[in-house]
């Protein structure tokens, strides 16, 4: 768990309930996490990408994961990086991760849930419907699965199997072309 001031490493996994208590109820600093989980460690600064992990989830700001960070992730055996923000990984870091066999899910696909949920909300409102949380969640899961399938399929069809950046770009472009064609623009 990473914030601008520092980060927490919990070998037993992040305790989401404790984190919510600290940040949402107490409005305290991340340093308080240690009081809830004695085996956890708090570190000042940016070193979060130096921890041995299987999966890294850069979800904060643009360009937060740099080439040096990507090298540390690869050296520590990271197998996948999934962006949860708008371009949190620099181009150099993305290329390095891909060149070293790390599965890389770009934010334009992996982070599409927020935009998709907004579209669902607009649809619901325009039709004067009231969906339950479960209904919205099911619709969102379906959208995200379709995005993933389209990304993987596009990468494979164009000879870039496993390159999800290319797959997401092509799949997105195809959607725009289909919409423009349907509107008679092309």
Located regions from the model:
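Rossmann-fold NAD(P) dinucleotide-binding segment
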Residues: 43-53, 63-80
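Short, well-ordered coil/turn residues at beta-beta hairpins
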Residues: 57-59, 84
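Adenosine-phosphate binding glycine-rich loop
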Residues: 72-186
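Flexible, active-site-adjacent loop/turn segments at secondary-structure boundaries
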Residues: 5-7, 12-20, 31, 63, ...
């Amino acid at each position: 768990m990473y914030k601008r001031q520092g980060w927490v490493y919990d070998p037993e996994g992040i305790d989401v309930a404790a984190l919510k208590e600290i940040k949402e109820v107490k409005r305290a600093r991340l340093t308080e996490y240690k009081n809830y989980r004695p085996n956890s460690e708090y570190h000042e600064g940016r070193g979060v990408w130096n921890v041995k992990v299987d999966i890294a989830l850069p979800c904060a700001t643009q360009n937060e994961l740099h080439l040096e960070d990507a090298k540390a992730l690869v050296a520590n055996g990271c197998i996948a990086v999934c962006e949860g923000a708008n371009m949190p990984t620099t181009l150099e870091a993305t290329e390095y991760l891909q060149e070293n066999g790390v599965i890389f899910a770009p934010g334009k696909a992996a982070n599409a849930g927020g935009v998709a949920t907004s579209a669902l909300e607009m649809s619901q409102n325009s039709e004067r419907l009231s969906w339950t949380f479960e209904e919205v969640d099911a619709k969102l899961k379906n959208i995200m699965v379709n995005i993933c399938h389209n990304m993987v399929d596009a990468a494979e069809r164009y000879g870039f199997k496993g390159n999800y950046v290319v797959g997401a770009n092509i799949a997105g472009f195809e959607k725009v072309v289909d919409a423009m064609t349907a509107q008679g623009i092309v």
